[in-house]
Protein backbone atom coordinates (compact mmCIF):
# COMPACT_ATOMS: atom_id res chain seq x y z
CA UNK A 1 0.00 0.00 0.00
CA UNK A 2 1.39 3.38 -1.05
CA UNK A 3 1.46 6.27 1.46
CA UNK A 4 -1.21 8.98 1.41
CA UNK A 5 0.40 12.43 1.26
CA UNK A 6 -2.84 14.33 1.99
CA UNK A 7 -2.49 17.15 4.50
CA UNK A 8 -1.28 20.64 5.18
CA UNK A 9 2.42 21.14 5.85
CA UNK A 10 4.38 24.16 7.09
CA UNK A 11 7.95 24.85 5.99
CA UNK A 12 10.56 24.08 8.64
CA UNK A 13 13.14 26.59 7.42
CA UNK A 14 15.96 25.59 9.87
CA UNK A 15 15.64 21.91 8.89
CA UNK A 16 15.74 22.70 5.16
CA UNK A 17 18.96 22.81 3.13
CA UNK A 18 18.61 25.47 0.45
CA UNK A 19 20.85 26.65 -2.38
CA UNK A 20 22.83 29.89 -2.19
CA UNK A 21 20.23 31.50 -4.48
CA UNK A 22 17.22 30.59 -2.33
CA UNK A 23 18.59 30.40 1.24
CA UNK A 24 18.99 34.16 1.86
CA UNK A 25 15.43 34.99 0.75
CA UNK A 26 13.31 31.97 1.81
CA UNK A 27 11.17 32.95 4.79
CA UNK A 28 8.15 30.68 5.13
CA UNK A 29 5.91 28.33 3.23
CA UNK A 30 2.82 26.17 3.23
CA UNK A 31 2.19 23.04 1.16
CA UNK A 32 -1.35 21.64 0.86
CA UNK A 33 -1.77 18.21 -0.72
CA UNK A 34 -4.90 16.27 -1.65
CA UNK A 35 -3.93 12.72 -2.55
CA UNK A 36 -6.52 10.18 -3.66
CA UNK A 37 -4.43 7.62 -5.53
CA UNK A 38 -3.77 8.02 -8.40
CA UNK A 39 -4.83 11.71 -8.31
CA UNK A 40 -2.36 14.07 -6.60
CA UNK A 41 -3.08 17.79 -6.18
CA UNK A 42 -0.58 20.21 -4.63
CA UNK A 43 -0.82 23.90 -3.79
CA UNK A 44 2.36 25.50 -2.47
CA UNK A 45 3.03 29.04 -1.29
CA UNK A 46 6.63 30.00 -0.50
CA UNK A 47 7.46 33.49 0.77
CA UNK A 48 10.73 34.74 -0.73
CA UNK A 49 12.00 38.16 0.32
CA UNK A 50 8.54 39.13 1.57
CA UNK A 51 6.72 38.10 -1.62
CA UNK A 52 4.52 34.99 -1.84
CA UNK A 53 5.14 32.68 -4.81
CA UNK A 54 2.38 30.19 -5.51
CA UNK A 55 2.47 27.01 -7.54
CA UNK A 56 -0.25 24.45 -8.16
CA UNK A 57 -0.46 21.20 -10.01
CA UNK A 58 -2.70 18.19 -10.40
CA UNK A 59 -1.38 14.99 -11.94
CA UNK A 60 -1.98 11.25 -11.90
CA UNK A 61 0.76 9.03 -10.47
CA UNK A 62 0.79 6.76 -13.51
CA UNK A 63 4.01 8.19 -14.99
CA UNK A 64 2.33 9.28 -18.22
CA UNK A 65 3.48 12.51 -19.83
CA UNK A 66 1.04 15.42 -19.81
CA UNK A 67 1.84 18.11 -22.37
CA UNK A 68 0.61 21.70 -21.99
CA UNK A 69 1.45 25.02 -23.60
CA UNK A 70 1.78 28.16 -21.49
CA UNK A 71 3.03 31.53 -22.67
CA UNK A 72 4.92 30.16 -25.66
CA UNK A 73 6.48 27.37 -23.63
CA UNK A 74 5.80 23.66 -23.97
CA UNK A 75 5.64 21.91 -20.60
CA UNK A 76 5.89 18.13 -20.25
CA UNK A 77 4.82 16.93 -16.77
CA UNK A 78 5.01 13.49 -15.16
CA UNK A 79 4.26 12.05 -11.71
CA UNK A 80 5.48 8.57 -10.79
CA UNK A 81 6.13 6.38 -7.80
CA UNK A 82 9.71 5.51 -6.83
CA UNK A 83 9.24 3.09 -3.95
CA UNK A 84 7.24 5.04 -1.34
CA UNK A 85 8.30 8.41 -2.80
CA UNK A 86 6.42 10.41 -5.42
CA UNK A 87 8.52 12.15 -8.08
CA UNK A 88 7.09 14.99 -10.17
CA UNK A 89 9.06 16.33 -13.12
CA UNK A 90 8.45 19.27 -15.43
CA UNK A 91 10.44 19.69 -18.63
CA UNK A 92 9.89 23.24 -19.84
CA UNK A 93 10.80 23.93 -23.48
CA UNK A 94 11.01 27.65 -24.21
CA UNK A 95 12.69 30.06 -26.59
CA UNK A 96 15.82 30.08 -24.39
CA UNK A 97 16.20 26.29 -24.20
CA UNK A 98 15.04 23.62 -21.79
CA UNK A 99 14.67 23.75 -18.02
CA UNK A 100 13.90 20.65 -15.94
CA UNK A 101 12.43 20.92 -12.43
CA UNK A 102 11.78 17.87 -10.28
CA UNK A 103 10.56 17.28 -6.74
CA UNK A 104 10.87 13.99 -4.87
CA UNK A 105 8.26 13.88 -2.09
CA UNK A 106 8.82 11.53 0.85
CA UNK A 107 6.98 11.19 4.15
CA UNK A 108 9.10 10.78 7.29
CA UNK A 109 8.54 10.37 11.03
CA UNK A 110 5.32 8.42 10.59
CA UNK A 111 3.89 11.02 8.22
CA UNK A 112 4.54 14.00 10.48
CA UNK A 113 7.26 15.36 8.18
CA UNK A 114 7.40 15.75 4.40
CA UNK A 115 10.74 16.00 2.63
CA UNK A 116 10.70 17.61 -0.82
CA UNK A 117 14.02 17.29 -2.68
CA UNK A 118 14.03 19.82 -5.53
CA UNK A 119 16.38 19.72 -8.48
CA UNK A 120 16.47 22.47 -11.11
CA UNK A 121 18.59 22.10 -14.24
CA UNK A 122 18.99 24.45 -17.20
CA UNK A 123 18.43 28.10 -17.88
CA UNK A 124 21.78 28.96 -16.29
CA UNK A 125 20.46 28.48 -12.76
CA UNK A 126 21.12 24.90 -11.73
CA UNK A 127 20.29 24.34 -8.08
CA UNK A 128 19.32 21.73 -5.51
CA UNK A 129 17.07 22.46 -2.54
CA UNK A 130 15.90 20.18 0.25
CA UNK A 131 12.63 21.57 1.60
CA UNK A 132 11.39 20.10 4.90
CA UNK A 133 7.75 20.57 5.91
CA UNK A 134 6.00 19.64 9.18
CA UNK A 135 2.39 18.41 9.19
CA UNK A 136 0.07 21.04 10.64
Go through the PLM ranges and name each one.
Residues 1-136:
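Hydrophobic small-molecule pocket/channel-lining residues, especially in calycin-type beta-barrels
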